[in-house]
Amino acid sequence: MDALVLKKPRGLTKGFFASLSIVLILLGAVGSILESVLLNDDSSPDFLALGAIALLLRALSLASLPIILFLLSEELDRIKNKGRAAALIFILALVAEIPYNLIVGEKIVYTATRSPALAFFLCYIIACLWEREKRLKVPLNIAVALSALWWSAILSIDEGIPCILIFTVCFWLRKKGTLGLFCTSVVLSAVALADPMYTLALPVPALLHFYKE
């Protein structure tokens, strides 16, 4: 009797998506550098072409946000020490501000965040609250999300509101397969209507369909 051969399910691993998001973020950094250079020198004959490239690279970087938020929602159950993870994410978010500020600005510290790193921390905190208080009623869960949106607006966290909206859908529908990705696509479409820079992020839910654990 021939031995049974178990085939591994085909798909794209979290390592692939993590690497893709890093590449997109780096492209966005290049776009920000190019934009900063063009603002200081608008006499270049290729000003319009380079400006369009800078805008395209920044739009591509926004496509990394739904990928990171999706991975965060998927990996949340596997994090054992959530307090330590929260501290690590917060420290990394603060450290990420320094090079970002130097790239797109002239100061090391600004009163408002200039990168979406703190938005990931805020999403992680509300997810921990949802996980810890699983018996919370729907109105209280909504109140947690609304308070996160409020803090995001008060602290002027860059891309904070879109990140919270996208993450909320990813978190609550993370075990729903195609339905979850469809709802994520709907939210992304609404975000893109408000901010056309998110247009290039619209194909991301279709790509996440091939995610495998």
Language model regions located:
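Alpha-helical transmembrane segments and their immediate juxtamembrane cytosolic regions
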Residues: 1-213
